[in-house]
């Protein structure tokens, strides 16, 4: 016994060292070398092998936490602060004064605080993400202890027997056992664009995707020993710079350039023109460097996104890519699967409506044949509905011997079972899409019209059709062609809409998100479902728009516009989904796409936000950006709202950061150059530390999500920041002038004068300027965070408490601090009250400035000017050219298109204009509803006339 165990271990160690070529030896030798059988491993044997071979996952590079911490100090914004620290001790050593150690220590402290917060939050976010992704860890169907079960793919070991089916990502390198050939997509590994066919005995690689078929396989390699694992060792991963990082860089560069311009002007004016002393000049440059850099920006934005990602996961949307949050906030088109997302995917069959085509057969026999062509295990919704109609699910296989089952695949769109009955005769039954089954039928030409009539009748009631066919197989083999196919019957399938779908679609349209239904069903079903859901019914078969046989009635119209204006697409194939997304993106839409199957992967990858719905295949999950853990459309709309709230916080902060940079650079530059006022750099450092501490709480601020799709508009951020910053800089300059050059405040409020009493004595004035700048700078966040009046939208409790504490500290410093090293002196409570009053008065116009900026940037102001000019012109010729255009215009209107001369979305830059598409979708839905009511009214009136009733009396009691 001991010898056998040792022999097994020696053989397995040889496999581990790759001394045996398990990819090429006959399959029998694979079992021999792996000391396993087709009955699978026992749990004990699997545990022993797991200890030997390790987990079935790639080794993760362990990053030094200390180096990661230092990495947060290695970015352009940090470099500027580090340069300021060096200036404080190297260049500031002159003018009879020692090096500026307090500023040096303060700058380093600020850097360490920001890096520590970033490090802790990213670490927490990383741990949370790892826990969430563990829920999405790939699963594998494995045979252990003689029973099939679903296990984490990470515990697979060589020798395990696994099952691979359509949509699965192959969990480990394996050799296929007996069964039908598989279609495997190896493009991610080998670059082969077309799926390859793999038969019994062939090897399949970990990471490839099953596109068709179902088969069992024996695992021959796991983890780093797989083909994928070896390739991953050879390829060094590269970090792609995302859009979010580009935005951060652009804002950082703007702030750095603003500071550089301010410093250059100061250097040119102070030294060659004003002949200022060396040391005060360096101090003034330090003020711009320290105060102007938004050093907390990367920390605030990453913390905001990490907290937001956690909130999304609580709502049932796990973000695989953090920056998908900003794209979700800007999404204006959502292409949603009908089945399972808009509907319940709980199919029911009405036996009374079954249409029988084969003589001698009743509805019960049609159901039994359909049940035979269904899987009893791993059922999809259709199989479950049909087998569930039987009195006992076992009846589906009662009295027959299964020879071969052909699983569903997207190409054939049908399943089939070859079986032997009690008398030893072989038969085959198939169920699937009516068109596919009809093509099999030997008498297609005779029954085609009736079949289509029944399908249309079902479709008008929102019912899908499922066809059933039957044939004898005299040869008795699974691969025999068999005799002529008999078209047995058509079954109606009803998939009821989700109870919340109609309300969710209405919410989406109100949020500026146009929902487009994507369905593989025929057009009539799509329109009927759309009607029930309160959508418009402006839908097209996707093949009529994108296929080879385009509809003649719309062939002359622009396909891109038709897609843009459509409420849905029917008869959709996977390649059509990709094309729809591509064309919507070409028209400047941020497009979301839901999907669940392996064939949805290309479209999910192409979409700006790929959303894998609940119960999606591994392939769909791996291609998506967001994975839903709850079914339905409402989860997506909730995620959109949350994403917009997260994005709003980030946008509010960036406007605030740019404004502060401009106000510090412009304000202190003017004070230094006009009045030769030298503000102490240490006090700017105190402002920065208090500001950064307060602003961290914006990540949990209470905000109203944008009512429209939102995105980074850098020109808007910079323009708003420059206007706000310039206004606040002027506030400081005016305050300085009134305090220093006039006796207005002492005369009005009875406070002491702040005029300097000795040469270079600006100590009390410095305290006053410090408090004025500190209060209004932090108060600006309340203006940038609100869409309406800042005093109406209540901020989050954390932000409010942080602001009060920070400004209490700032006020106490200004009132009491007598710091010789910082060159400030306490000004008393009287001046503190004056400064608070001054800031409150000048705070009020900030809201008006915000409204004016928004109005000016929207283009409305300039549109009005243009419209007034156009109003005085008139069109003289309404002749021939106009009449020629009328027919084309009528055709476009019929299909919901705008006039050809109207600017389309490609030319539009403002979100409110893009939102017109959602508004038009709402209008179409309303028109469809009114049309239905009008039809109903006409029907009622005709019945009333037929019955000879008094219509006037009825109309007084009821209105439509």
Curated annotation (Swiss-Prot):
It is a multi-pass membrane protein. Residues 958-960 are annotated as: Interaction with 14-3-3 proteins. The gene is AHA4. The plasma membrane H(+) ATPase of plants and fungi generates a proton gradient that drives the active transport of nutrients by H(+)-symport. The resulting external acidification and/or internal alkinization may mediate growth responses. Belongs to the cation transport ATPase (P-type) (TC 3.A.3) family. Type IIIA subfamily. NCBIfam families: ATPase-IIIA_H, ATPase_P-type. This is ATPase 4, plasma membrane-type. Residues 1-69, 123-251, 300-651, 702-717, 785-796, 847-960 are cytoplasmic. GO terms for cellular component: plasma membrane. The modification Phosphothreonine is found at residues 893, 959. GO terms for molecular function: ATP binding; ATP hydrolysis activity; metal ion binding; P-type proton-exporting transporter activity. Its EC number is 7.1.2.1. Binds to 14-3-3 proteins. The binding is induced by phosphorylation of Thr-959. Binding to 14-3-3 proteins activates the H(+)-ATPase. It is found in: Cell membrane. Pfam families: Cation_ATPase_N (PF00690), E1-E2_ATPase (PF00122), Hydrolase (PF00702). The active site is at residue 337. Disulfide bonds: none annotated. Mg(2+) binds at residues 596, 600. CDD domains: P-type_ATPase_H. GO terms for biological process: proton export across plasma membrane; response to salt stress.
């Amino acid at each position: 016994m001991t010898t056998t165990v040792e022999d097994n271990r020696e053989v397995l160690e040889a496999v581990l060292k790759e001394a045996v070529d398990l990819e090429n030896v006959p399959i029998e030798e694979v079992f021999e070398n792996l000391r396993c059988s087709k009955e699978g491993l026992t749990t004990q044997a699997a545990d022993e092998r797991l200890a030997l071979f390790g987990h079935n996952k790639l080794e993760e590079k362990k990053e030094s936490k200390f180096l990661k911490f230092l990495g947060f100090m290695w970015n352009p914004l940090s470099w500027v602060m580090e340069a300021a620290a060096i200036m404080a001790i190297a260049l500031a050593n002159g003018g009879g004064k020692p090096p500026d150690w307090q500023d040096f220590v303060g700058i380093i402290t600020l850097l360490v605080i920001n890096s520590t917060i970033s490090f802790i939050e990213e670490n927490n976010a990383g741990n949370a993400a790892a826990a969430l992704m563990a829920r999405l860890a790939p699963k594998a169907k494995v045979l252990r202890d003689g029973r099939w079960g679903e296990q984490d793919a990470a515990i697979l070991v060589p020798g395990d027997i696994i099952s691979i089916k359509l949509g699965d990502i192959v969990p480990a390198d394996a050799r296929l056992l007996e069964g039908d050939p598989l279609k495997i997509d190896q493009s991610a590994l080998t670059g082969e664009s077309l799926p390859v066919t793999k038969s019994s005995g062939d090897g399949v690689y970990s990471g490839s995707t099953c596109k068709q078929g179902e088969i069992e396989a024996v695992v021959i390699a796991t983890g780093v020993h797989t083909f994928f694992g070896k390739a991953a060792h050879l390829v060094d991963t590269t970090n792609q710079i995302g859009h979010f990082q580009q935005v951060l860089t652009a804002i950082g560069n703007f702030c750095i350039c603003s500071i550089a311009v301010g410093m250059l002007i100061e250097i040119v004016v102070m030294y060659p023109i004003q002949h200022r002393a060396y040391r005060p000049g360096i101090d003034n440059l330090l003020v711009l460097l320290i105060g102007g850099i938004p050093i907390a920006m990367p920390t605030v934005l990453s913390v905001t996104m990490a907290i937001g990602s956690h909130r999304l996961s609580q709502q049932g949307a796990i973000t695989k890519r953090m920056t998908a949050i900003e794209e979700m906030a800007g999404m204006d088109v959502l292409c949603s699967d009908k089945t399972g997302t808009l509907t319940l995917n709980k199919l029911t069959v009405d036996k009374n409506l079954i249409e029988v085509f084969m003589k001698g057969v009743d509805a019960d026999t049609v159901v039994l044949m359909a049940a035979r062509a269904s899987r009893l295990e791993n059922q999809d919704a259709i199989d479950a509905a049909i087998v569930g109609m039987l009195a006992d699910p076992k009846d589906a296989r009662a009295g027959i011997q299964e020879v071969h089952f052909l699983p569903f695949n997207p190409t054939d769109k049908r399943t089939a079972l070859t079986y032997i009955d009690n008398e030893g005769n072989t038969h085959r039954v198939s169920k699937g899409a009516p068109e596919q089954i009809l093509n099999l039928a030997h008498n297609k030409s005779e029954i085609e019209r009736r079949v289509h009539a029944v399908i249309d009748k079902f479709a008008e009631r929102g019912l899908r059709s499922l066809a059933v066919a039957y044939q004898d197989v005299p040869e008795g083999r699974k691969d025999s062609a068999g005799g002529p196919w008999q078209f047995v019957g058509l079954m109606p399938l009803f998939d009821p809409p989700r109870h919340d779908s109609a309300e969710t679609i209405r919410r989406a349209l109100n949020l500026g998100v146009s929902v487009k239904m994507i369905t593989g069903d025929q057009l009539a079903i799509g329109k009927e479902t759309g009607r029930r859901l309160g959508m418009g019914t402006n839908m097209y078969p996707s093949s009529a728009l994108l296929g080879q046989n385009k509809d003649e009635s719309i062939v002359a119209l622009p396909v891109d516009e038709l897609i843009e204006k459509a409420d849905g697409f029917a008869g959709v194939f996977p390649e059509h989904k990709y094309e729809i997304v591509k064309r919507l993106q070409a028209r400047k839409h941020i497009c979301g796409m839901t999907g669940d199957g392996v064939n949805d992967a290309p479209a999910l990858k192409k979409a700006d936000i790929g959303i894998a719905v609940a119960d999606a295949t591994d392939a769909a999950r791996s291609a998506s950006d967001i994975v839903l853990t709850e079914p339905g459309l409402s989860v997506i709309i909730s995620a959109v709202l949350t994403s917009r709230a997260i994005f709003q916080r980030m946008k509010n902060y960036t406007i605030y950061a740019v404004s502060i940079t401009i106000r510090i650079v412009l304000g202190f530059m003017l004070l230094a150059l006009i009045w030769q006022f030298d503000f102490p750099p240490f006090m700017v450092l105190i402002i920065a530390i208090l500001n950064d501490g307060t602003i961290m709480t914006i990540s949990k601020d209470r905000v109203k999500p944008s009512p429209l799709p939102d995105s980074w508009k850098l020109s808007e951020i910079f323009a708003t920041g420059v206007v706000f910053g310039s206004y606040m800089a002027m506030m400081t300059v005016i305050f300085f002038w009134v305090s220093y050059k006039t006796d207005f405040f002492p005369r009005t409020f009875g406070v002491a004068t702040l005029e300097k009493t000795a040469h270079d004595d600006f100590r009390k004035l410095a305290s006053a300027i410090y408090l004025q700048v500190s209060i209004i700078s932090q108060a600006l966040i309340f203006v940038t965070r609100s869409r309406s009046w800042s005093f109406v939208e209540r901020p989050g409790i954390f932000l409010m408490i942080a602001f009060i504490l920070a400004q209490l500290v700032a006020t106490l410093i200004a009132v009491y601090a007598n710091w010789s090293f910082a060159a400030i002196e306490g000004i008393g409570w009287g001046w503190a009250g004056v400064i608070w009053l001054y800031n409150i008065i000048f705070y009020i116009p900030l809201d008006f400035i915000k409204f004016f900026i928004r109005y000016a940037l929207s283009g409305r102001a300039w549109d009005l000017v243009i419209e007034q000019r156009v109003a005085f012109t008139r069109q003289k010729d309404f002749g021939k050219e106009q009449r020629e255009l009328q027919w084309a215009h009528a055709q476009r209107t019929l299909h919901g298109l705008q006039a050809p001369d109207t600017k389309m979305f490609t030319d539009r830059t403002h979100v409110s204009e893009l939102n017109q598409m959602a508004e038009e979708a709402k209008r179409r839905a309303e028109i469809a509803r009114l049309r239905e009511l009008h039809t109903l009214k006409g029907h009622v009136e005709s019945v009333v006339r037929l019955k000879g009733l008094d219509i006037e009396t009825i109309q007084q009691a009821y209105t439509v």
